UniProtKB/Swiss-Prot annotation:
Belongs to the DnaA family. GO terms for cellular component: cytoplasm; plasma membrane. Keywords: ATP-binding, Cytoplasm, DNA replication, DNA-binding, Lipid-binding, Nucleotide-binding. The keyword ATP-binding applies. It comes from the Bacteria. Its main location: cytoplasm. One of its GO terms (molecular function) is ATP binding. This is Chromosomal replication initiator protein DnaA. Residues 348-472 are annotated as: Domain IV, binds dsDNA. The gene is dnaA.
Length: 472
């Protein structure tokens, strides 16, 4: 057998030995690169998949490969861009099924024991599912390379609450689909079982509910409401940072739900380690489960999003117009869809077909970068400091610790790109560094942007925060 046949058969064996969401999320997109000298090399599409396989699936992989090959091998996982998903393997039925390979379909019945009826709770909307937007479903979410892992993780959580990744922490810039994914989890879970208790709120709503409960002397009712649910979905959790009372209450809410085997899903515009003034005990808990970044959509994904939006609006939009928008609007999904809406409205008001010329006219103010907000050096230092969780004084200083080098080089890049500061002036802002050092840092970021997707996402997110939603 060649490597493709070996891996095809191995995956079929693995389907009987691990949970389906684990298989779909972590193993389906891998490939067997080579088998030689008792060493099997497996290619993973990204760092996260590689780490999860090494942490959780090495023994079962060795065993499955040994069964297929007829001899035992060691396994090494590498990152490989050439890891196409094979044709769906047929699960191999073992002659003597082991009890450990059977996975019972989870039931939500256990979640509802001793939980009060929602309409008996005095705080907030009594119908918790009513806050979920029915349009936010997995089927309406456009999946691309920038969000594939986040989508798979959310699907796993929706299918098997508290059994896959708990908590699940999504982070990324504004308008990238985090809210869509959070609400898709709730809608999917409720479609499977209308009796499941799902609560989707923003961190601001959580804070306001707590304040109102304290004012009305209803803190016990507040705790009953938030601690007797099956799936808690909280958007923009970064806003509880610096609010001691809210963090204290959420800490105990988190512990109660997690200890009871309930699912918690959080979203933020930055990873836990970069949320300044977040209590360490909360930060560590947010890192217990899986942390996934939702990146800015690539060109292919932007094109697919625009096509889907055009079909939803039932408006004929040519491929030329879609390509024009996809190439020029690169910041986020929200702005992308908003620009298409604007172009269509402009065409309707002027009673003209949707053409590239019409799109260019409708978006003239957005595409004219000269009309963007003027960014200052202080703006850049502030946003980079918050994004990476590094104090501004450390970035400006002379220290050379590893955790400061990248943020400092990003500052050099943004100051060079977004302001009129000279290399000498940038060096003065960074502790009196020589202009050649600044040029080296700028060139380093420029070169890395061609191959480092995470760095590209960082720069785009920073520009979004510097300019608002109309970042380039």
């Amino acid at each position: 057998m060649d490597t493709k046949q070996i891996w095809f058969t191995t995956l079929g064996t693995l389907q009987n030995q691990i949970l389906r969401y684990d298989y779909d999320t972590w193993l389906k997109t891998t490939a067997l690169v080579s088998v030689a000298n008792d060493l099997a090399v497996i290619g993973a599409p990204n760092v996260t998949t590689k780490q999860v396989i090494e942490d959780r699936f090495m023994s079962v992989l060795r065993r499955a490969l040994g069964e297929v090959l007829g001899y035992q091998v060691n396994v090494r996982v590498i990152i490989s861009s050439a890891t196409p998903a094979p044709s769906e393997p047929v699960a191999v039925t073992p002659s003597e099924p082991s009890p450990t390979t059977e996975v019972a379909e989870p039931s939500f019945a256990s979640f509802n024991q001793a939980a009060p009826m929602l309409n008996q709770l005095p705080l907030g909307d009594p119908n918790r599912s009513s806050v979920l937007n029915p349009r936010y479903t997995f089927s309406s979410f456009i999946v691309g390379t920038s969000n594939r892992l986040a989508h798979a993780a959310c699907m796993a959580v929706a299918e098997h609450p508290a059994q896959a990744y708990n908590p699940l922490f999504l982070y990324g810039g504004v308008g990238l689909g985090k809210t869509h994914l959070l609400q898709a989890i709730g809608n999917y879970a409720l479609d499977r079982n209308p009796e499941v208790n799902v609560l989707y709120v923003s961190s601001e709503k959580f804070t306001n509910d707590l304040i109102n409960a304290i004012r009305r002397q209803q803190t016990e009712e507040f705790r009953i409401r938030y601690r007797n649910i099956d799936i808690l979905l909280i958007d923009d959790i970064q806003f509880i940072a610096g609010k001691e009372g809210t963090q204290e209450e959420f800490f105990h809410t988190f512990n109660t739900l997690h200890g009871a085997g309930k699912q918690i899903v959080l979203s933020s515009d930055r990873p836990p380690k970069a949320i300044l003034t977040l209590e360490e005990r909360l930060r560590s808990r947010f890192e217990w489960g899986l942390i996934v970044d939702v990146q800015n959509p690539d060109l292919e994904t932007r094109t697919a999003i625009l096509r889907a939006k055009g079909e939803t609006l039932q408006v004929p939009v040519s491929s030329e117009v879609i390509d024009f928008l996809a190439q020029r609007i690169q910041s986020n999904i929200r702005e992308l869809e908003g620009c298409l809406n604007r172009v269509i409205a402009y065409a309707n008001l002027n009673r003209t077909p949707v053409t590239v010329e019409v799109a260019s006219a409708a978006l003239a103010d957005l595409l004219d970068t000269s009309r963007r907000k003027r960014v200052t050096a202080d703006d850049i230092f502030r946003e980079v400091s918050q994004h990476y969780g590094i104090d501004q004084r450390a970035i400006r200083g002379r220290g050379r610790s590893r955790n400061v080098v990248l943020p400092r080089q990003v500052v050099m890049y943004l100051l060079r790109e977004e302001t009129d500061a000279s290399l000498v002036e940038i060096g003065e802002l960074l502790g009196g560094r020589d202009h050649t050092t600044v040029m080296h840092g700028y060139n380093k970021i420029t070169d890395d942007l061609t191959s480092d997707a995470r760095l590209r996402n960082d720069i785009t997110s920073l520009r979004q925060r510097l300019y608002g939603e109309n970042a380039r």
